[in-house]
Amino acid sequence: MSGKYLVTGGAGYVGSVVAQHLVEAGNEVVVLHNLSTGFRAGVPAGASFYRGDIRDQDFMRKVFRGRLSFDGVLHFAAFSQVGESVVKPEKYWDNNVGGTMALLEAMRGAGVRRLVFSSTAATYGEPEQVPIVESAPTRPTNPYGASKLAVDHMITGEAAAHGLGAVSVPYFNVAGANRGVRLVHDPESHLIPLVLQVAQGRREAISVYGDDYPTPDTCVRDYIHVADLAEAHLLAVRRRPGNEHLICNLGNGNGFSVREVVETVRRVTGHPIPEIMAPRRGRDPAVLVASAGTAREKLGWNPSRADLAIVSDAWEWHSSHPKGYDDRG
């Protein structure tokens, strides 16, 4: 069933891929992005584009008035750099929390009652056990994770008070290309693309932060393909709305170490990847792996790419876009 959807932050990596999937499924899509990060080139053909900031309440009201009867909103607009959030926490509270507050107000005023929120595993902080289930304690260790958790609490309140039907999807480490289309995180901070930049000669080496974890070598993470992630968002936004806030972790349920990722990049690219050993970064957990049972049960989601083949199509994109996208429209 086709519909009309607003994608905030839809010129960024994940948001642009989700917008593309929505367009290809026959939906009318409006992308909203301020382009402080992200790239205009990432907005898929067939989607309308509004350049503006979700914190601007007048702008948001105009977007909703100009596009009557949005069937739902998929919300990606957020700052997401953990390190920056530690030194500039106010930036994250203002944008991630304040921006979502303005979005919820605009949705309420327009009678839009369906929301999918792009959340993060950072809301859980240091896990007590893995795989991580949705009922796990939420104790974020940085302002970025705290800001996302605050948004989750806001959404829960909105659902109870005003009948919002919402799904939050905390996901873990996303990578890969989507049928040849991949944007870059801006600025890049994720392991797989950083290692691929070493293979391209754009970086001299990859820093490995600690090899003294209680793992076979280095810390272990759950990697999810961006196309699988996009499919989960589409399934979530199609759920029947109601005064409920559902949280569904998205991941493959298995983990790979930093060393395994580096070795895979060496094999796929044929390039040596020099490593620089560095101390652990603060409170980096040894293992972060998701339990996606709720997403499977409630959304009918089944990821189709559960191994490091994710590296191959990411390398294909990086090889054809050696400098990434360099326009901001």
UniProtKB/Swiss-Prot annotation:
Keywords: Carbohydrate metabolism, Galactose metabolism, Isomerase, NAD
Pathway participation: Carbohydrate metabolism; galactose metabolism
Binding site for substrate: 120, 144, 173, 190-191, 207-209, 221, 281-284
Broad EC category: isomerase
MF (Gene Ontology): UDP-glucose 4-epimerase activity
Residue numbers annotated as active site: 144 (proton acceptor)
EC numbers for this chain: 5.1.3.2
Binding site for NAD(+): 13-14, 33-38, 53-54, 76-80, 95, 120, 144, 148, 172
GO biological process terms held by the UniProt record: galactose catabolic process via UDP-galactose, Leloir pathway
Descriptive protein name: UDP-glucose 4-epimerase
Gene that encodes the chain: galE
